[in-house]
Amino acid sequence: MAKAKFERTKPHVNIGTIGHIDHGKTTLTAAITKVLHDAYPDLNEASAFDQIDKAPEERQRGITISIAHVEYQTETRHYAHVDCPGHADYIKNMITGAAQMDGAILVVAATDGPMPQTKEHVLLARQVGVPYIVVALNKADMVDDEEILELVELEVRELLSEYEFPGDDLPVVKVSALKALEGDKEWGQSVLDLMKAVDENIPQPERDVDKPFLMPIEDVFTITGRGTVVTGRIERGVLKVNETVDIVGIKTEKTTTTVTGIEMFRKLLDEGQAGENVGLLLRGIKREDVERGQVIIKPGSVTPHTEFEAQAYILSKDEGGRHTPFFNNYRPQFYFRTTDVTGVVTLPEGTEMVMPGDNTEMTVELIQPVAMEEGLKFAIREGGRTVGAGQVTKINK
C-alpha cells in the first residue's frame, strides 16, 4: 500500500456530513475513517460507528448540541469532520456555527432520494454560508436499476440548483457506506473516490491571517503619558505598528486613527495577528471616544448597519431558554462580539409566533449600528440570559 507521509504542513479543512435522518451520515463518517485507515494506516485511526453515534454533548453559548468530531487525512489534506446524531443538533450547529464547515458532504440515500430534511439542510447550508457541497449517493448497492440511480441524482442536482449551489457541476459519487464499512473492496474504493472528490472540489479555505484586520474592543483604558489603549482578541488579519485603522459601530460616525504601539503580555510587538490577545495604543484618541462593542478594522473593510435578516435558533425551556413563545415586535438584546444592542424583531409573513426550541428567519432593526457582515454570529439575550443564537444572512441597511 502506498505510504503517505505525515506532514504538519498539510492544509487543514473542516467538513461535515449533512442530510436526512437514516440516510447514512454516521455510517459514512465511520466508513471514511475505516477506508482511509486501511489505505494510509500511519495517518489514520478508524472510528467505529458507535463511537461517532454516541457523540458527547457540547454547550455552545448555553445551547446543548451533540456533535461528533473525527479527524482523518487523505494524501494531500488533514480533515476535521463533524457529524451530528440528531436533526435538531444539525440545525443548532449550522446556525450557531459551533463547528464551522468549509464544505459539506450531502448524504442522500439512493433508495429514497431527497427528503424534507435534505431540503432543510441544503437551505441552511446556503443561508449560513457553507460554501461547497459534494454529494454522496449512499446505499447505491441496494438499487439495481441504473435508471433509478440517474433519476435520484438528477433530483439531488435540481434541489441543489434551486438553492443556488452549482447543481449541474458539483460531484455526485455513488457509495455504499455500509458495504465499505464491512470491508467490501469495490465499495471501499467508492469511498476513496468520494474523498478524492472532496479533495478536489472543496477549496482550501482562506486563513484568518490573510483576511482584512478586525479586532472587537473588549476594554479601554488610559495610560498616563502614553494615551488610550484598547484591548481585545484579534479576530482576523494582521496589524503592524503605525498602520491606520477605523473604529466603527455603536456610534454614528467612524473614527480614524493610527496604532502607535502593539503590546502582548507587556511586551511590545511589531505586529499582532489573528488569535492574539493584544493591547493597541491609539494616537490622539480620548478614552471617551471609544467603547466596548466597537471594532477596530482595516479602513473601509466593514461598515456599521442597523437592519438585517437572520436565521436564528431559539433555546428550548430545558436549555434554559424562554418558557413562552414570542411574537412580532419582540425586543430582546442582540449580543454581537462583545456587547448587547437592543433590537426589534419582525417575523416572516405567515409566522404568528416562535416557540422555544424553534428555528426561524427574522428581520431585526437595532437601536444602534453594529459593524457587521453576512455570516456574523450573535446571541439573543434577555437581561443577560441567552435565549437564542443566530447569524446574519442578509444586510438591509
Swiss-Prot record:
It catalyses: GTP + H2O = GDP + phosphate + H(+). Residues 138-141 are annotated as: G4. GO terms for cellular component: cytosol. It is found in: Cytoplasm. Belongs to the TRAFAC class translation factor GTPase superfamily. Classic translation factor GTPase family. EF-Tu/EF-1A subfamily. GO terms for molecular function: GTP binding; GTPase activity; translation elongation factor activity. Its EC number is 3.6.5.3. Residues 83-86 are annotated as: G3. Monomer. This is Elongation factor Tu 1. InterPro entries: EF-Tu_GTP-bd (IPR041709), EF-Tu_GTPase (IPR050055), EFTu-like_2 (IPR004161), EFTU_2 (IPR033720), G_TR_CS (IPR031157), P-loop_NTPase (IPR027417), Small_GTP-bd (IPR005225), T_Tr_GTP-bd_dom (IPR000795). GTP hydrolase that promotes the GTP-dependent binding of aminoacyl-tRNA to the A-site of ribosomes during protein biosynthesis. Gene3D superfamilies: P-loop containing nucleotide triphosphate hydrolases, Translation factors. It holds the Pfam family GTP_EFTU_D2. GTP binds at residues 19-26, 83-87, 138-141. Residues 19-26 are annotated as: G1. Residues 10-206 form the tr-type G domain. Residues 176-178 are annotated as: G5. It is an enzyme of class 3 (hydrolase).
